[in-house]
């Protein structure tokens, strides 16, 4: 029996014999198709590329990204590089780490590739705001309060003013000097702020 066969049939309603052409696959042809498909699948090697998650503070450079390639045949020269759109100026948040395969010897066609992106998490940078301690005599006006803002990134302009509840009429004692931040750059949300009050000592 050949791989392709022709058959005839009689139509029951009229009793007239009409030759109908049917094209059927024999068992041999069907097996050939199935085996060919299986062979093509068997020649495709699973390759899984996974980027490792990473993290850094706002304003810092990106770390060296890493990851894994699983399923690479011995001797194949496929490598991977990792990239993200995030840079030191990127706001706090999550960014994809995307693997890109490098195939100098055109071997990638032998693989069925699965790509798993990683996540770069940018967290708020620590910002320390401190008011300096100072003393004065009772009955005197408050001096100009000073302090420091430490940990600014990317040229951000965030300053502090300092104030105290004490007045010239306040009795001798200790009073808090409280910093208040002024966010000229609009980037205060990218910082984790710690505030250290100063102390105004009013002497008798």
Protein language model annotation of sequence segments:
Residues 1-43:
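Sec-dependent, cleavable N-terminal signal peptides
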Residues 22-25, 38-204:
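Solvent-exposed beta-strand/loop surfaces, strongest in extracytoplasmic domains of secreted
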């Amino acid at each position: 029996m050949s791989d392709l066969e022709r058959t005839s049939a009689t139509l029951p309603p009229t009793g007239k014999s009409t030759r109908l052409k049917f094209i059927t696959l024999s068992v041999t042809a069907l097996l050939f198709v199935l085996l060919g498909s299986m062979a093509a699948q068997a020649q495709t090697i699973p390759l899984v590329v996974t980027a490792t998650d990473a993290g850094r503070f706002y304003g810092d450079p990106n770390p060296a990204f890493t990851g894994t390639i699983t399923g690479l045949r011995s001797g194949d020269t496929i490598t991977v590089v990792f990239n993200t759109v995030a840079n030191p100026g990127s706001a706090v948040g999550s960014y994809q780490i995307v693997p890109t395969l490098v195939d100098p010897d055109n071997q990638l066609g032998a693989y069925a590739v699965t790509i798993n992106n990683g996540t770069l998490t940018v967290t708020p940078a620590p910002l320390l705001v401190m008011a300096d301690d100072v003393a004065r005599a009772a009955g005197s006006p408050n001096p100009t309060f000073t302090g420091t803002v430490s940990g600014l990134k990317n040229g951000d302009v965030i300053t502090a003013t300092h104030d105290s509840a004490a007045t010239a009429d306040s009795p001798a004692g200790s009073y808090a000097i409280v910093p208040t931040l002024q966010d000229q750059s609009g980037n205060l949300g990218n910082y984790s702020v710690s505030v250290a009050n100063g102390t105004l000592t009013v002497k008798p």
